[in-house]
Amino acid sequence: MVKIGILGSTGRVGSLLIDDLQNDKDAKLSAVHVTSKLLKTLPQDTIVTNDIKVLFDSCDVIIDFSKPSGTEALLTEVIENGAKKPLVIATTGLNKHQQNLLLEASKLVPILYATNMSLGVAVLNKLVTLASKTLRDFDIEIVEQHHRHKIDAPSGTALTLAEHAASARDLNLDDVRISGRDGNIGARTKDEIAVMALRGGDIVGRHTVGLYNDGEFLELNHTATARNTFSKGAIKVAKWIVGKDAKLYSINDALGL
């Protein structure tokens, strides 16, 4: 039985993790880290703490669906204080410093980082790589749609999809990405990859990667209809990463893609 701790337990997905773990045969909820009141019923033996060290000491693996500042504290505990538990990190919006901490910590403990824990999105990333490499003359446009409360844009998933598309064409995404068009901007350049964000309603998540050419186009789409798509995926990879060597893993590693 894998003992799982949660960072970000008061968030939308964190709340679903608590529910899903209470019905899992191979894993149990052992600890939750809280920074505000937790409005959930927990198993009696669950440790509730606001101390990162206690969280590490109380589980076999930590799932992180927090904010960038929470992820930074988690990684700092590994780097500076020698905490040695595997991490599954799904926080989006990490800045460059936090990304560097992620790389440094992965030399010390196994870390699986994914901007989206959906198994379908993992397959979509592979399809985008294949299509972008094969259809080199096609223009690439990416549109992501989320609920009105999402605070970062574009989504981490959209940026990951764009990274796969750019890498497949030997391009640096920072050199070719645009986030909007307005006014008399001239014709589209050959290599640019547009990543557009839409916000409204209660959309869980929808990502469309379009490849457009004269006479034909291809659109690859993933739509999440329930948020526990992400919690169930995170639990699956948390079980997988226990016992692995220190390294930075992707969800593709866990799925054998």
From Swiss-Prot:
Catalytic activity: (S)-2,3,4,5-tetrahydrodipicolinate + NAD(+) + H2O = (2S,4S)-4-hydroxy-2,3,4,5-tetrahydrodipicolinate + NADH + H(+); (S)-2,3,4,5-tetrahydrodipicolinate + NADP(+) + H2O = (2S,4S)-4-hydroxy-2,3,4,5-tetrahydrodipicolinate + NADPH + H(+)
One example GO MF annotation: oxidoreductase activity, acting on CH or CH2 groups, NAD or NADP as acceptor
Catalytic site: H146, K150
One GO term (biological process): diaminopimelate biosynthetic process
Its job: Catalyzes the conversion of 4-hydroxy-tetrahydrodipicolinate (HTPA) to tetrahydrodipicolinate.
GO cellular component terms, A-Z: cytosol
Descriptive protein name: 4-hydroxy-tetrahydrodipicolinate reductase
Native source species: Aliarcobacter butzleri (strain RM4018)
Matching InterPro entries: DapB_C (IPR022663), DapB_N (IPR000846), DapB_N_CS (IPR022664), DHDPR_bac (IPR023940), NAD(P)-bd_dom_sf (IPR036291)
Pfam name, any one: DapB_N
Positions that bind (S)-2,3,4,5-tetrahydrodipicolinate: H147, G156, T157
Database matches in PANTHER family: 4-HYDROXY-TETRAHYDRODIPICOLINATE REDUCTASE 1, CHLOROPLASTIC-RELATED, DIHYDRODIPICOLINATE REDUCTASE
Keyword Isomerase: no
Residue positions binding NAD(+): G8, S9, T10, G11, R12, V13, A90, T91, T92, A114, T115, N116, M117
Alphabetic keyword roster: Amino-acid biosynthesis, Cytoplasm, Diaminopimelate biosynthesis, Lysine biosynthesis, NAD, NADP, Oxidoreductase
Compartments (UniProt record): Cytoplasm
Taxonomic lineage of the native organism: Bacteria, Pseudomonadati, Campylobacterota, Epsilonproteobacteria, Campylobacterales
Pathway it works in: Amino-acid biosynthesis; L-lysine biosynthesis via DAP pathway; (S)-tetrahydrodipicolinate from L-aspartate: step 4/4
E.C. number: 1.17.1.8
